[in-house]
């Protein structure tokens, strides 16, 4: 394709969040003219950011996307490695469950700082222009036209070759695509909300072990804590909304934490706990699925706009960043031909993003309940053992999702296959132990004892002579044995 044509391509990126700003970097490298429209003010100058601010877990997929635009080292240097889950039981006991091998870890990063860094990186490209406080009013993908409303309150029509919807779970771009025939959409609010709390530094250092994702699992709800660069921890309490609604006073909150998170109170402090708890109401969590992710060659959805997921597998940002990376790889493959790239992008990403959405739902149950069980710990130890002796044959689900770029839906399929293999292996092992035990029992048992086992009615005589079994009960058993022997 002629380079002058490529340079004339104009792209409107709707949304200047994590995925939107990263996608602007990817597209700017292709010499497209990029305009990013963000409804909020510039987060780098905002005095207070309201709403979602859950700490993020950056893993392999996200790092590969950042690496492709030359930002991996910068972002990684601002993250804190977390090598394992640290489980806090109700009794105060702590136990670590490694994520993978000693060299494998995820990174705790600040959403706010990461967004600022990505915006700054995008603005460094001369062909990128940021438009803050610009809200999308209309989107007409057939004609490649959008209407935006800036701070001057005057609607402005903008024409472009490609509209990229990166405007989050409540995407305006997606809402316009939903009016098109054969566009499928579903959403689900889970019955749990989240609330953020803070564990401040203690004597200038971390109040807990910093290189862990701390979890307080309590079956129907849980709390997690991720470390920050300033030696604090950001805690997130996930709980059904009806439970949040029961905590109306300061005493209610303190009593609740004393009952379910007693070891967290001295870490947070009662005063700060109450202050943070009533600062903002519990926030909802939504899961969104749609199909397809594109419309002709003029519009595409990325990140939460295409597949908002609950945060319990730590893959929301990573999946969104991988969207950008896959899109970039396809643009290379098809030489920037959007008519070829967009349909393949939808075909590849829809099964993967739906798979990680389902896994995230499943992982909430695992995090809040299963991690307490001995069987769960046994399974994790077995997975690590099998992976150690057969690294290319047996790969734990978490490793496939977090430390590789195996496609999400393929990871799920492989996980189900591996579970079947393990279950069959355990059944075979159990059967072998049972048969071996029976053989040894028979082989070393005296003939007289063996004869008693073969003839159940002889047991009755044995009970009559050696126990204080009631006589009437023995007589009843004799009657049954006589029927059996006939």
From Swiss-Prot:
FAD binds at residues 19, 37-40, 57, 111, 136, 172, 304, 317-318. The chain crosses the membrane at residues 385-404, 425-445. Changing residue 363 to A: Strongly decreases kynurenine 3-monooxygenase activity. It catalyses: L-kynurenine + NADPH + O2 + H(+) = 3-hydroxy-L-kynurenine + NADP(+) + H2O. Gene3D superfamilies: FAD/NAD(P)-binding domain (3.50.50.60). One of its GO terms (cellular component) is extracellular space. It is a multi-pass membrane protein. The keyword Transcription does not apply. It holds the Pfam family FAD_binding_3. Keywords: FAD, Flavoprotein, Glycoprotein, Membrane, Mitochondrion, Mitochondrion outer membrane, Monooxygenase, NADP, Oxidoreductase, Pyridine nucleotide biosynthesis, Transmembrane, Transmembrane helix. Glycans are attached at residue 465. One of its GO terms (biological process) is L-kynurenine metabolic process. Coiled coil: none annotated. L-kynurenine binds at residues 85, 99, 363, 398. Its EC number is 1.14.13.9. Transmembrane domains are required for enzymatic activity. Increased in neuroinflammatory conditions. Inhibitors are investigated as potential neuroprotective drugs since they lead to an increased level of kynurenic acid, a neuroprotective NMDA receptor agonist. Belongs to the aromatic-ring hydroxylase family. KMO subfamily. HAMAP family: Kynurenine_monooxygenase. This is Kynurenine 3-monooxygenase. The lineage of its organism: Eukaryota, Metazoa, Chordata, Craniata, Vertebrata. The gene is KMO.
């Amino acid at each position: 394709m002629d380079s002058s044509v490529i340079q004339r391509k104009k792209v409107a990126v709707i949304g200047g969040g994590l995925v939107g700003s990263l996608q602007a970097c990817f597209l700017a490298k292709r010499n497209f003219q990029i305009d990013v429209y963000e409804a909020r003010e510039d987060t780098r100058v905002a005095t207070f950011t309201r709403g979602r601010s859950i700490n993020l877990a950056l893993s392999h997929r996200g790092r590969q996307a950042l690496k492709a635009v030359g930002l991996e080292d910068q972002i990684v240097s601002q993250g804190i490695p977390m090598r394992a889950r640290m489980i806090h039981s109700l009794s105060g006991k702590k136990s670590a469950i490694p994520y993978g091998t000693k060299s494998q870890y995820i990174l705790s990063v600040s959403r706010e700082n990461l967004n600022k860094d990505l915006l700054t990186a995008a603005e460094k490209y001369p062909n990128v222009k940021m438009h803050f406080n610009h809200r999308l009013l209309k989107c007409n993908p057939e004609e490649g036209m959008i209407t935006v409303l800036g701070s001057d309150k005057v609607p402005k029509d903008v024409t472009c070759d490609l509209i990229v919807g990166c405007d989050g779970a409540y995407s305006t771009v997606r809402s316009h695509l939903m009016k098109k025939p054969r566009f499928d959409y579903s959403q689900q609010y889970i019955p749990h909300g989240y609330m953020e709390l803070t564990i401040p530094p203690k004597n200038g250092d971390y109040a807990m072990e910093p290189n862990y994702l701390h979890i307080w699992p309590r079956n129907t709800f849980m709390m997690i804590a991720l470390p920050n660069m300033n030696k604090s921890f950001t805690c997130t309490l996930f709980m059904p909304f009806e439970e949040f609604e029961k905590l109306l006073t300061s005493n209610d909150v303190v009593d609740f934490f004393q009952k379910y998170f007693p070891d967290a109170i001295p870490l947070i402090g009662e005063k700060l706990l109450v202050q943070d708890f009533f600062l903002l109401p519990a926030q909802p969590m939504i899961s969104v699925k749609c199909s397809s992710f594109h419309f002709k060659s003029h519009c595409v959805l990325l990140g939460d706009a295409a597949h908002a997921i609950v945060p319990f597998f730590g893959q929301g940002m990573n999946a969104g960043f991988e969207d950008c990376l896959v899109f970039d790889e396809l643009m290379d493959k098809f030489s920037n031909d959007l008519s070829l790239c967009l349909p393949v992008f939808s075909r590849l990403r829809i099964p993967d993003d739906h798979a990680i959405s389902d896994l995230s739902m499943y992982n909430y149950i695992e995090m809040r309940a299963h991690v307490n069980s001995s069987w769960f710990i046994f399974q994790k130890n077995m997975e690590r053992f099998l992976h150690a002796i057969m690294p290319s044959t047996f790969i734990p689900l978490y490793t496939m999702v977090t430390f590789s770029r195996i496609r999400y839906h393929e990871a799920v399929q492989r996980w189900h296959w591996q579970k079947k293999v393990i279950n069959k292996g355990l059944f075979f092992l159990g059967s072998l132990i049972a048969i071996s035990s029976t053989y040894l029992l028979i082989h070393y048992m005296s003939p007289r004892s063996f004869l008693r086992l073969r003839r159940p009615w002889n047991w009755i005589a044995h009970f009559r002579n050696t126990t204080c079994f009631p006589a009437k009960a023995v007589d009843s058993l004799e009657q049954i044995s006589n029927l059996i022997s006939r």
